[in-house]
UniProtKB/Swiss-Prot annotation:
This protein's UniProt keywords: Cytoplasm, Nucleus, Ribonucleoprotein, Ribosomal protein
Gene, per the UniProt record: rps1501
Protein name (record): Small ribosomal subunit protein uS19A
PANTHER family (alphabetical): RIBOSOMAL PROTEIN S19P FAMILY MEMBER (PTHR11880), SMALL RIBOSOMAL SUBUNIT PROTEIN US19 (PTHR11880:SF2)
Subunit structure: Component of the small ribosomal subunit (SSU). Mature yeast ribosomes consist of a small (40S) and a large (60S) subunit. The 40S small subunit contains 1 molecule of ribosomal RNA (18S rRNA) and at least 33 different proteins. The large 60S subunit contains 3 rRNA molecules (25S, 5.8S and 5S rRNA) and at least 46 different proteins.
Keyword Cytoplasm (UniProt): yes
Gene Ontology molecular function, alphabetical: RNA binding; structural constituent of ribosome
UniProt record, GO biological process: cytoplasmic translation; ribosomal small subunit assembly
Family per record: Belongs to the universal ribosomal protein uS19 family.
Originating organism: Schizosaccharomyces pombe (strain 972 / ATCC 24843) (Fission yeast)
Functional description taken from the UniProt entry: Component of the ribosome, a large ribonucleoprotein complex responsible for the synthesis of proteins in the cell. The small ribosomal subunit (SSU) binds messenger RNAs (mRNAs) and translates the encoded message by selecting cognate aminoacyl-transfer RNA (tRNA) molecules. The large subunit (LSU) contains the ribosomal catalytic site termed the peptidyl transferase center (PTC), which catalyzes the formation of peptide bonds, thereby polymerizing the amino acids delivered by tRNAs into a polypeptide chain.
Major subcellular site: cytoplasm
Lineage: Eukaryota, Fungi, Dikarya, Ascomycota, Taphrinomycotina
Entry keyword annotation includes NAD: no
SUPFAM superfamilies: Ribosomal protein S19
Length: 153
């Protein structure tokens, strides 16, 4: 009788324990992504990002990554690093950038974005919209032929 009760308690504890989904980019977990060499990482990217990486990131992107590393090392333990501002909207998000806070320029101001694992392989510009989405109001006079019959205010 006691064995059945212990078994029931153990099963209840297992159900209670929440399992969190670990992030995987193309089947490779984040910890393993950080350990991959540049060539192995490039093989995981989609064609456009792969071509960009093979042609080289360039001096501006390298300088940006150095600033991100510096901000991460200077950040206190268990705190977000300082924001690193950039105009590089065409920068591909790499695994080492995860956890950083980036100010992405949209043509007018810098939008602060915290880099999450789901963003790997995307461009920075995808997370800072450059236009203000329209909010359509009521149609004005002359919008359509039927608007002639709408009484004026």
């Amino acid at each position: 009788m006691a064995e059945e009760h212990d078994e029931a308690v153990r099963v209840a504890e297992l159900r209670k324990k929440r399992s969190f989904r670990t992030f995987a980019y193309r089947g490779v977990e984040l910890e393993q992504l950080l350990d991959l060499s540049a060539e192995q990482l490039v093989d995981l990217f989609h064609a456009r990002a792969r071509r960009r990486m093979l042609r080289g990131l360039g001096p501006n992107a390298s300088r940006f990554i150095r600033k991100l590393r510096k901000a991460k090392t200077e950040a206190p333990l268990n705190e977000k690093p300082a924001t690193v501002k950039t105009h590089l909207r065409n920068m591909i998000i790499l695994p080492e950038m995860v956890g950083s806070v980036v100010g992405i320029y949209n043509g007018k101001l810098f939008n602060q974005v915290e880099i999450r694992p789901e963003m790997i392989g995307h461009y920075l510009g995808e997370f800072s919209i450059t236009y203000k989405p329209t909010k359509h109001g009521r149609p004005g006079i002359g919008a359509t032929h039927s608007s002639r019959f709408i009484p004026l205010k």
